[in-house]
């Protein structure tokens, strides 16, 4: 159950969704550009020291480019692993990454934490109980809570306060 001021919504009501480009050695038209794969993505961060390159046409650049504030979600591997693109420059993505771009003002960080919750509870990527892969169709079937915007921000602040306290405790004992 959720509070009465909240509602349940499907992903497509909150985010415009695309996946990246599949690597195809026969595709040689376009411009060679760097892109990220699931191996560059970790929970809440990116490792960008070893980027791959492939050729992108102009239309693929539009479809496969992420910009600051986009929520990226892994389709396979560590299914549901998510991070928010926080850089001031665009980047392309390969096909095993979902790009979620909000239609309107929402706390993208709140939905990052929802993906973290869904992963930790086995709703996605679980052992036989949740969604095993995160295809576009599977992603679109997921329900997400939609609290008022002020509550989204308050919840994120509370989560980050607790995580900061945990980090402080871990630092003091190590």
What do these predicted ranges mean?
Residues 8, 43-45, 80-82, 164:
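Flexible loop/turn segments at secondary-structure boundaries
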Residues 78, 117-120, 161, 165-168:
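Short, well-ordered loop/turn and helix-capping segments at boundaries between secondary-structure elements
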Residues 12-25, 39-68:
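Sequence-specific dsDNA recognition surfaces
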Residues 24-32, 50, 125-129:
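Short coil/turn segments at secondary-structure boundaries
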Residues 37-38, 54-119, 125-128, 133-135, ...:
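A short beta-sheet element
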Residues 4-6, 15, 40, 77, ...:
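Short, flexible loop/turn elements at secondary-structure junctions
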Residues 142-145:
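Long, hydrophobic alpha/beta structural blocks
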């Amino acid at each position: 159950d959720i509070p009465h001021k909240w509602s349940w919504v499907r992903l497509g009501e909150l985010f415009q969704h695309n996946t990246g480009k599949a690597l195809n050695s026969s595709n040689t038209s376009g411009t060679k550009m760097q892109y990220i794969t699931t191996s560059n993505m970790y929970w809440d961060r990116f490792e960008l020291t070893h980027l791959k390159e492939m050729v992108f046409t102009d239309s693929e650049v539009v479809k496969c480019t992420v910009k600051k504030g986009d929520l990226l979600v892994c389709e396979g591997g560590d299914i549901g692993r998510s991070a928010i693109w926080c850089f001031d420059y665009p980047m392309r993505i390969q096909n095993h990454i979902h790009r979620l771009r909000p239609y309107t003002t929402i706390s993208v960080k709140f939905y990052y934490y929802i993906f973290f919750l869904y992963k930790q509870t086995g709703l996605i990527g679980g052992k036989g109980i949740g969604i095993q892969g995160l295809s576009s169709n599977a992603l679109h079937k997921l329900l997400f809570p939609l609290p008022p915007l002020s509550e989204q921000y308050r919840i994120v602040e509370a989560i980050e306060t607790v995580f900061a306290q945990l980090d402080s405790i871990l630092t003091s004992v190590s």
